[in-house]
Amino acid sequence: MQRMEEIAFKALNRVNNDRYLLANILFARIDELSKGAKPLVNMDVKKHKLTDIAMTEVAEGKIALSQIDQL
């Protein structure tokens, strides 16, 4: 598993270093995960923080802004 700093760096690169946009995407995805959505990455919800799961999903390109806009 990569360090969270590396994952956060990759996630920021995915959103063109827009921290505000990243925060909004993470908030929306964490809300989905807390309501029972399945993680799009191989991470156990019981072992990892929802923030870490959402950040990893963004870093790996599993979550796009267009998906969040549909909420």
UniProtKB/Swiss-Prot annotation:
Gene3D superfamilies registered for this protein in UniProt: 3.90.940.10
Database matches in SUPFAM superfamilies: RPB6/omega subunit-like
GO cellular component: DNA-directed RNA polymerase complex
Keyword field: DNA-directed RNA polymerase, Nucleotidyltransferase, Transcription, Transferase
Cystine residue pairs: none
The EC number(s) this enzyme carries: 2.7.7.6
A GO BP annotation: DNA-templated transcription
Example GO molecular function: DNA binding
Superkingdom of the source species: Bacteria
Reaction(s) catalysed (UniProt annotation): RNA(n) + a ribonucleoside 5'-triphosphate = RNA(n+1) + diphosphate
Enzyme class, first EC level, given as a word: transferase
Family (UniProt): Belongs to the RNA polymerase subunit omega family.
HAMAP family, per database record: RNApol_bact_RpoZ
The protein's role, per its UniProt record: Promotes RNA polymerase assembly. Latches the N- and C-terminal regions of the beta' subunit thereby facilitating its interaction with the beta and alpha subunits.
Quaternary structure note: The RNAP catalytic core consists of 2 alpha, 1 beta/beta' and 1 omega subunit. When a sigma factor is associated with the core the holoenzyme is formed, which can initiate transcription.
Protein name listed in UniProt: DNA-directed RNA polymerase subunit omega
Organism: Wolinella succinogenes (strain ATCC 29543 / DSM 1740 / CCUG 13145 / JCM 31913 / LMG 7466 / NCTC 11488 / FDC 602W)
